Amino acid sequence: MTFNPETGKLYIQDVTLRVGMHAILHMYGTESVRTIAKALDDAGVDAIEVSHGDGLNGTSFNYGFGAHTDWEWIEAAADVIKNAVLTTLLVPGIGTVEELRRAYALGVRSVRVATHCTEADVAKQHIGIARDLGMDVSGFLMMSHMIDAEALAQQALLMESYGAHCVYVTDSGGALDMDGVRDRLRAYDRVLKPETQRGIHAHHNLSLGVANSIVAAQEGAVRIDASLAGMGAGAGNAPLEVFVAAADRKGWNHGCDVMALMDAAEDIIRPLQDRPVRVDRETLSLGYAGVYSSFLRHAEKAAEQYGLDTREILIELGKRRMVGGQEDMIVDVALDLVSARAA
């Protein structure tokens, strides 16, 4: 373990303006981005991530079209951020090194390079170029619940070897419990250098986002992802104001104003939600089935279109071990379920 929350300062990475895009179908207006980014910056978070929900260049028929371009969102945030590090996310194959360079030119100084948990090797070029640009770089191993701890650690080792300053346990499905988080971070400790930071990206589908983040910090994760009011895919991410309040009670140094975060969550974020970000029968099914949280809104749309229960689709997606990037298969699964019902 390389970090101790009892003695060190946590690095609070807000994801409201990236993962939170999924919750409102990538429809943040630029004025909302300014308002949210300023509130987060004023409240003392260390970093603010901004992009389409699926990362740079994510706007598409497959993932959903954004209300604005990544550049318009990033520029809006950059206009008001004075202290926090402006961050973005890039999924190789969706975003390219050209998008990365443009983001850097607009003021982005930290990037999370995200791959499926078994595909770290596709991140080599992007991590290397980000390092060449002088950026802070994290490796982001999505759907970390889908392989065991030792296998995940080997993927983390690859990301470290490419130059990542930090490697995350990324619980995209909100399917990990505290033991799963603990096991994965301990496996990281067995293979990663002490100077390589660890991070946790939790989702709240089983209502464990905050608990998993606390356990992660206790196991050496210094970078904690969270979002205002949990704004994010599925049941959302670890709610930022809740995590900070819990960390406060433990006496941990997080550098944030918990009351300001509460106000931002309640006054700014909740009114933007066209669908409540919460644990309900659909979002719980994501964690139960181990399904990519971003599939929620796509599955709800398909269920309505074909007269199905959203849970049926999500459970079947889990059985088929579908992963991020296979959003186009959700309709195929729905049609298969309709055919099976008619048979």
UniProtKB/Swiss-Prot annotation:
One of its GO terms (molecular function) is manganese ion binding. Signal peptide: none annotated. Mn(2+) binds at H201, H203. GO terms for biological process: catabolic process; L-leucine biosynthetic process. The keyword Iron does not apply. It is an enzyme of class 4 (lyase). Keywords: Aromatic hydrocarbons catabolism, Lyase, Manganese, Metal-binding. PANTHER family: 2-ISOPROPYLMALATE SYNTHASE 1, CHLOROPLASTIC-RELATED, HOMOCITRATE SYNTHASE-RELATED. Belongs to the 4-hydroxy-2-oxovalerate aldolase family. HAMAP family: HOA. This is 4-hydroxy-2-oxovalerate aldolase. It comes from Sphingobium yanoikuyae.
